[in-house]
C-alpha cells in the first residue's frame, strides 16, 4: 500500500518522494526511518497498515522524535488512500508547496 500511496502522489504531479528515508537530527543522530520523505519540505509521510499495539507504540515514539527534530509528519491509512485519494493528494500538496 505504501507503493500505491507513492504512485498516487506522483500521478497527481507531486515530486517523487524519497522512499524509506533515514532521518537525522541537527547533531546527525538517527531519528527514524520513514516511508516517504520530501526533503525540501522536511515532510515525512507514513503509511499505517494493520498494526498491533507494540508497533503502534513504537510508531508514536518515532513520530515524537521526528517532530522534536523539526520534521513534519503526515500519516495515512488504506482507508484514506483508497477511500478518499483526492484528500490525501490535497493534504500532501499543501504541505509540500505551502
Question: PLM features: residue spans?
Answer:
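Surface segments flanking catalytic/ligand-binding clefts of nucleic-acid enzymes
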Residues: 1-98
